[in-house]
């Protein structure tokens, strides 16, 4: 098999080393917004194992104290790369601590907005950055400058809010330029990536299509076959279309009806993908197999792993059934994994812990016989939507709300049965139907109904009822890393609740989830 270049080897790349800040992913997003490719890895990344050389390195913020015994620290080999380095918040303190300066608790913690004063206008990091509002989030502070560094910026409470090495392109800032509250933060990040690191602004979806198609062809070769999971969602559809563009009929799209799909989903997917996009599609009804294995299981992590493992078994079986005309065996399994999936599943001792196994990157068998191919794993959601439109996929499909790989199984809290799935499925259908009628669908990033494992007393007619509870969720987000709940009008929620209680047998009560991410995740399980 020919060697396949990583995206970070094809495009000039800024490496973001994550120390656990809730804002770390925003650094990557901001850089990509001005067409510079950025990749985030844990701060524990060994530079010798990287396999590519970044144009520059950014050390993120984090919740630790650099002087603590259990504090995470960057691989010192990063300083041997000979590339510019920018430390943000904890990253500044890490740079100073490594250089021998004293870092300790501040007299008072500094959270929220502050006024930045640029002290060194000649510093290239602050080119076209004036005194402005910045966002602070720290309890520790630098007590003295490290040797060979000078001050570039200050705030009222931070005399070393910006520092720079006297002769090397090493910079530190105590504030967070990646958040929108820092009014000129994007300019500062662009100065670092484009002016200081000299990273080419070539990261566009047009360029990505050409690069990724070539990568797929190199990876798969001229004869191998690929089998791909599709669900009718944005991610799997874009991945399937991209694969079809790359290898044509050697790609076999498979829809597994796992018994926990949306209402009429199998028929709709067959029409849209098969007839509309010309993708060769096979529908496999494995609903009984999935539901049987889920019987009696209530733990959400176990559900995910069961669904992931069963999914792989079904695909291996289907791959064996399909006989390619050229006699080659199917070698690859396509998945529509996105970059947020990868970020959320990173787990290392210290700054970050896995919140839950992601349905696209977790729950896979160790002995999986098919090789995984994930052409979208470097992309955020908005990038995937843009890519889909460039590939000729309809606006309606490209902007369809996400649907999780485990489907309604993680929207039925508790044991998953055919009856419980049907209740959640019907409630969800009514909810989405009303959102569309109200003209709100494209204003909302994701919406769904889930069935709670509790019962509630109700009154239907003159009869007392004791039935289940539906929770509705709708969120607004740009990247699914953070999200706010959608503020529906009360009359809208009243109407939806009335329809669900009256039309879905077994439901006595409807609630609306008003929790943001963080602290909650988008899905309940």
Swiss-Prot record:
Residues that bind XMP: 304, 462, 517, 523
A single GO molecular function term of this UniProt record: ATP binding
Species per Swiss-Prot/TrEMBL record: Eremothecium gossypii (strain ATCC 10895 / CBS 109.51 / FGSC 9923 / NRRL Y-1056) (Yeast)
Pathway(s) annotated for this protein in UniProt: Purine metabolism; GMP biosynthesis; GMP from XMP (L-Gln route): step 1/1
Cofactor annotation: Mg(2+)
Lineage top rank: taxon: Eukaryota
Biological process annotations from GO: GMP biosynthetic process
Subunit and partners: Homodimer.
Binding site for ATP: 231-237
Protein name: GMP synthase [glutamine-hydrolyzing]
Entry keyword Nucleotide-binding: yes
Gene it is expressed from: GUA1
Domain (Glutamine amidotransferase type-1): residue spans on this chain: 13-202
């Amino acid at each position: 098999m020919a060697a396949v270049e990583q995206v970070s080897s094809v495009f000039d790349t800024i490496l973001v080393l994550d120390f656990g800040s809730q804002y770390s992913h925003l650094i990557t997003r901001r850089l990509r917004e001005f067409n510079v490719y950025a990749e985030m890895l844990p701060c524990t990344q060994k530079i010798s194992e990287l396999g590519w050389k970044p144009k520059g390195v950014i050390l993120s913020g984090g919740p630790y104290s650099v002087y603590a015994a259990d504090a995470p620290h960057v691989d010192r080999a990063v300083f041997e790369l000979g590339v510019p380095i920018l430390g943000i918040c904890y990253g500044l303190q890490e740079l100073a601590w490594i250089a021998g300066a004293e870092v300790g608790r501040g007299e008072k913690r500094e959270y929220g907005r502050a006024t930045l004063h640029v002290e060194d206008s000649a510093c290239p990091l602050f080119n076209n950055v004036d005194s402005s509002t910045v966002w602070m989030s720290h309890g520790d502070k630098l007590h003295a400058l490290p040797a060979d560094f000078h001050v570039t910026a200050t705030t009222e409470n931070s005399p070393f809010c910006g520092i720079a090495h006297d002769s090397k392109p090493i910079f530190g800032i105590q504030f967070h330029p990646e958040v929108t509250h820092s009014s000129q933060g994007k300019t500062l990040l662009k100065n670092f990536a484009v002016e200081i690191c000299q990273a080419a602004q070539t990261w566009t979806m047009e360029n990505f299509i050409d690069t990724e198609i070539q990568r797929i062809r190199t990876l798969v070769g001229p004869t191998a076959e690929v089998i791909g999971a599709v669900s009718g969602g944005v991610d799997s559809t874009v991945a399937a279309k991209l694969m079809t563009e790359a290898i044509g009929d050697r790609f076999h799209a498979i829809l597994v009806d796992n018994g926990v799909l949306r209402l009429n989903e199998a028929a709709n997917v067959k029409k849209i993908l098969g007839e509309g996009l010309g993708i060769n599609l096979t529908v496999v009804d494995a609903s009984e197999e999935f539901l049987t294995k889920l019987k009696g299981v209530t733990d959400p992590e176990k559900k995910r792993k069961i669904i992931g493992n069963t999914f792989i078994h079904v695909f291996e079986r289907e791959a064996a059934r399909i006989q390619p005309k050229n006699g080659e065996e199917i070698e690859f399994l396509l998945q529509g994994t996105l970059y947020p999936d990868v970020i959320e599943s990173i787990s290392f001792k210290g700054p970050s812990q896995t919140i839950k196994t992601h349905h696209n990157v977790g729950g896979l068998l160790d002995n999986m016989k098919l090789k995984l191919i994930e052409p979208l794993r470097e992309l955020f959601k908005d990038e995937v939507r843009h890519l889909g439109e460039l590939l000729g996929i309809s606006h309606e499909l490209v902007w369809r709300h996400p649907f999780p790989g485990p489907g309604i199984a993680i929207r039925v809290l508790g044991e998953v049965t055919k009856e419980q799935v049907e209740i959640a499925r019907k409630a969800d259908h009514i909810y989405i139907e009303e959102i569309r009628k109200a003209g709100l669908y494209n204003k909302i990033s994701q919406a769904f109904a889930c069935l709670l494992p509790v019962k509630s007393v109700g009154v239907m007619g003159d009869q007392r009822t004791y039935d289940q509870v539906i929770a509705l969720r709708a969120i607004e987000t740009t990247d699914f890393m953070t999200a706010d709940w959608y503020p529906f009008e009360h009359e809208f929620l009243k109407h939806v609740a009335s329809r669900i209680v009256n039309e879905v047998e077994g439901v006595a009560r409807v609630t609306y989830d008003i929790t943001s991410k963080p602290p909650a995740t988008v899905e309940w399980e």
